[in-house]
Amino acid sequence: MKFCSMNGPSESEVESLLMSPCWGPPQTSAQDQYLLDGHKLLLEHDLDSLPSDADQKNSLDVLDNLLLNGSSLNALSDLKPLPPFTGYTGHLSINGISGHHYHAIAQRLPDESNNNYMQSAYHPQNQSNPTSTTQSNGGSNSNSNNSNEHNIVSSSTCLPESVLSGSGGGGGGNDACLADVKLFADSQLDSKLYSVADSCVMNGSGSGSAANGNGSGPSIATLTPIDQVADSLHNSGVRIYKDLTEYVDMNSIDDIAAIIGSAIADTTVPNQLDKDDNNDTRDSWMDLDAWIDGNCIQQESAKVLVSQQDSLGDFILPHSPLPMHASSSTLQSLLSHGYMPLLQNRLQNGPPNGNSSGGGGGANQGAGIKGDPQAPTSTSYCNELAAATSSSCSPPGSVVSTTDNPNGLMINPRYLSNPTNNQATGNLHQQGGYSMQASGLSLKDNGLCSPDLLGNYPHTTTASTTGSEMRTGAPKAKRSRSQKKSNQQQQQQQQQQQQQGDGGGQPTTPQMSAISPSGFSASDLSGLLGKEKPVHRCSICNRGFLNKSNIKVHLRTHTGEKPFRCDVCAKAFRQKAHLLKHQQIHKRIGRD
């Protein structure tokens, strides 16, 4: 019996035929489909309806064997380590050719497409393979004619050197190692596949066996097993189509898509419940907003006021007291929560006597403003204010400067002189429409405002001590001093509001006659917000500076004076700091 020659492409075709998903039970809604060499086969009739004559029995047996052996595909994923190299040639696989077929391939003539074969001495006792399912039927003829020459088909990969060296030396005993060559572990798929392929040999292969025994005649049966299967199917009434679009079953695809969609979709919660949950979430947020609007009204109003007054926005906290036009309900809520203990004490005990500190004589006027019941009159009271407002967060205090012209006195009371009589003080406040009580500022014995109350001006960033502070003996502004400044002004504005509410807006002293909300102009508010002009101005460009030393340096830009000259390069500079920086260049050059 002659076996058909097998090579790599023919085996891949058989594997594609076996591993095709189209080898399934026949469907009632679609025709039977099979895959052959990358193309699908459309069977015009069901397999059960085909005639069962002797011509079709062989092809049906082939199909049944392929269908029944489909379960061996699962063994592909069960790969194990290589066994020891002792007698398991069935697991040999080189470039797609299984090892347990090397003995059967040795009995065949090489295919026309495969010109890579070699002559090797091969003993007949090595043809027995306990694991191979293929029968070597031509062994007796080959032994009687030529026992040392057989055609062995090799792959593109060279065989091991032990086999090649044994073949070149002519030693027959060394060729037995071919049965022990194992490169890759393979499954039972190849054995079953080739047993099916060997059963497809045509009837004329008997004469080819004799030619194979001589080792010189060409193979009569040149068709591969896959071609024989195709011919058998064609003779049984099977038509082969090339167009793959005719075999797409959209119904099955839709069913698979529906199954996948139902598996992916989250069906744990019904859609109606999801909608209810969304509504509950929205309602809960709406309830929270309503609760915030009802219980945090003062915080909202405070934010609005801060947005209107940009300069005070950096110094007013969300829980700080509000300006004069705040509602009385907000004031009561602040008092009830204990935010303003001093104001609450003042409202409960009443204002102090205005004549207690000022009196009627001019000798006592240095202790405070005469007739101003709201001004702080003692150091202990200032300490009390500092203790009450130490928890506020304000920027560090800085030195404040004012303008030289007398009109600036009504904006910033720092340079207000201590009045010698009440008439002069009243005229001064009536001219400017400004009151010390409204601003919440107090004067000291020399007429200068306390530095405790002058830390809320944004433009004052200098750290030097001015002459006015030197005269008053006040120390440099500290952080604690600025912390109590912001709330102190706000508290005294609340006191002014309460006084106007209790007294009906009636003035109690000659100075109070000038106090009214309409008496504040834009310039007055700018002074309160810290936008007053600097003290010293340039006589040429009218630019203001905080101290005179800055003006001297500034005047050099107009006059072109450069009194500081470098000793090395004779380059002149307006400021000494620039000269020192320039000298560093010469020092670096000298080191280099």
From Swiss-Prot:
GO-annotated cellular components: nucleus
Residue segments, region Disordered: 114-156, 343-377, 416-439, 459-527
Zinc finger (C2H2-type): 536-558, 564-586
Keyword Transcription regulation in record: yes
Presence of keyword Zinc: yes
GO molecular function, one term: zinc ion binding
Record's compositionally biased regions (Gly residues): 356-369
Signal peptide annotation: none
Pfam families: zf-C2H2
Effect of loss of the gene: Embryonic lethal. RNAi-mediated knockdown in the trachea of first instar larvae results in discontinuous tubes. RNAi-mediated knockdown in the tracheal terminal cells of first instar larva results in lumen devoid of taenidiae and occluded with disorganized electron-dense material, pan-tracheal liquid clearance defect as well as a breaks in the dorsal trunks.
Location within or outside the cell: Nucleus
Feature: compositional bias, Low complexity: 124-148, 488-500
Superkingdom to which the source organism belongs: Eukaryota
SUPFAM superfamilies reported for this sequence: beta-beta-alpha zinc fingers
Keywords: Activator, DNA-binding, Metal-binding, Nucleus, Repeat, Transcription, Transcription regulation, Zinc, Zinc-finger
Any one GO BP annotation for this protein: lumen formation, open tracheal system
Consequence recorded when altering H582Y: Probable loss of zinc ion coordination in the second zinc finger results in defects in cuticle elasticity, reduced sclerotization of the head skeleton and ventral epidermal denticles, and disruption of multiple aspects of tube morphogenesis in terminal cells including seamless tube growth, shape, and integrity
PANTHER family with a match to the protein in the record: C2H2-TYPE DOMAIN-CONTAINING PROTEIN (PTHR14196:SF10), ODD-SKIPPED - RELATED (PTHR14196)
General function of this protein: Transcriptional activator. In tracheal terminal cells, regulates the transcription of factors involved in the formation of a mature apical extracellular matrix (aECM) which is essential for the integrity and shape of seamless tubes.
Protein name, per record: Ichor
